[in-house]
Amino acid sequence: MKKLSFLFFLLVASITAFAANVTAGKKAAPLRAAAKMPTFCSETDANPQYYIVTFNRSGTCMSESTNGTDNCIRLYNSTGDASQQWKLVGTQDNFQFVNKNGNYAVVSSESIYTSEGGTNPNPIRASKSAQPGGYKLVVSSCMDNGAGFEVIANSKSGNNYMNLWGDPRGGNTIGFWKVGDQNNVVSFTNPGAMNGALDYKTVGVTGYSPTNMLTLWYDEPATTAQLYSGGQGYSNWMEYALPIGDGQFGASLFGGAYKDEIQFNEKTLWSGTAARSPYGGKGYGKYENFGSVFAEDLSGCCGTTDETAATGYLRQLDLTTATGLTQFTSPEGVTYTRQYIASNPARVVAAHYAADAKGKISMRFTLVPGSVLTSNVTYENEEAKFNGKLDLISYSAVMKVIPNGGTVETTEEGITVTDADEVLVILAGGTDYDISSPTYIANTSSLVSDVEARATAAADKGWRALYDEHLADYASLFGRLDFHLDGTANTLPTNKLIDTYNSGNGDNALMLEQLYFAYGRYLEIASSRGVDLPSNLQGIWSNMVQPAWNADIHSNINVQMNYWPAEPTNLSEMHLPFLNYIWNLAENHTEWKQWAQMQGQDRGWTCFTENNIFGGVSSFKNNYVIANAWYASHLWQHYRYTLDRDYLKRVFPAMLSASQFW
């Protein structure tokens, strides 16, 4: 079976998923984020500090098994119950893990078989007795998923570093492995008032219908929603997060009431090079997760009980305005509204945090690099930034926090805003990728300053001007076509539309079909503007360490499917990043000509099934050489719709060369 293209895949996976007045704080020297050493205690401490112990790569935490069939310490999403709260009894060099149930975490010699990692010879289990020799805590040098620590079992020889066993997407037992593995890294979180829960308790909005009918909406956060797939790890992102994008730079919105995550990507952030690599080879590279902005509520406006729940919770993506929204009301009657856009004119992601009462916004904002990127984040003057280099590509990201009212302080913990009326967050990111350059990179020396300037310009405009500019730009594209099915009304959360669709539930079924059509056009605009690259297998959105098929450009149908809506639905300009990519690689670079020669042809060009953004290919299905003919048909289709003779003169040599291959 052919893999689903991104636009179709995300339609199914995301919809089917329930589918400035600033009082300046201190301006210290640049601060760099680092792992904070947890507090150790003695066995007799009356008020020990407990922690949620989270494996950075999976985001799941140590807990006693809930299946009732074993005594393993397993990994689950945080709920904050007693079995997930651990004190560290002893010293950094010799301590015990003891949870609130009074159980120790010990190294077992009784192996366990797991489908996600095979046989785990020494799983961690719960015991009433201490671990002989205890554990040692060291700062990890592996920062692929953020700063953290590694735990050493002192009495164990050989592989003695505590490790998330098996596939990080589904693994939930703990074993031991070598030093420096990214599955080793853990962090320690103070349960605090949240008691370790992922989010405030929320009660969904009732009797709601969006102002604009073409809106995906939900009555619960993406972080706590029940998964259709039953999967772990990135499934909440895959099934529930809402995508926004300016065509090149985009974000996935989770809508947490307590801790709001804005996970972001940039289309050109790739590891790898232009080489031909073995299937799965490192030289081929992959699409990388750029990182996340976290906005943590410090006001304590809501809580985790029925009495302190956030009510009227709403999370939506308005396709008519390309605006994300999260809204809820606290027990004291204050309504909090958060809006999100990815502005193509400004080339930034912007988030606006507000309340209907003054002085109610108290939050801490942090910038966290993702995937294989540096964890060296610098905080200074209400700004966070990081930059670095992959195999070929250099990258830079900047977050600015601009409060109105209240106070703001920048520390190594992040940017803390207290008692503000509203807060604007600007996020910008970019790389030195340039498809017109023979080396695929250009302007490296100005990258950091260019990204900084973009963020500063957006911050200077302010939220209202940014939003108006964004809306005018987006509406000029999305508003070209109107498709309406009589009798439709958007009165059910999108996941409920999915649930009832197979029953043929009349107007609700038609509403879902109308949303599908609109969502396809929305995604085309959001993932295919700017740089001359097509949207990949996941468009421009990925929170994964290892995305499926590297989130690459698959030429055997997937990238073509991404662009089937472009011309027929009056979005011809969205087709151009794909068409210009074809023209550039066919005419201005050598790689595709080399692949043709590899197939015994003296003329022409071609590419294989799997392609990165540097003209590189993998060895997977490298007998598939007919992509050139299919690509040429896209070049011709655009001319048929636009009758643009200047365009035809430019791309005709690439079409001719493709035919000469045959």
State the predicted function of each range.
Residues 1-27:
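Bacterial Sec-dependent N-terminal signal peptides
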Residues 21-199:
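Lectin-like carbohydrate-binding module/patch detector with strong preference for beta-trefoil
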Residues 54, 505, 623:
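Residue-level marker of regulatory loop/turn positions in helix-turn-helix DNA-binding domains and
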Residues 198-619, 637-639, 645, 656-659:
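Aromatic-residue-lined binding/catalytic grooves and analogous aromatic/hydrophobic interfacial grooves
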Residues 616-623, 650:
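C-terminal intrinsically disordered extensions
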Residues 625-661:
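Active-site neighborhood of glycoside hydrolase catalytic domains
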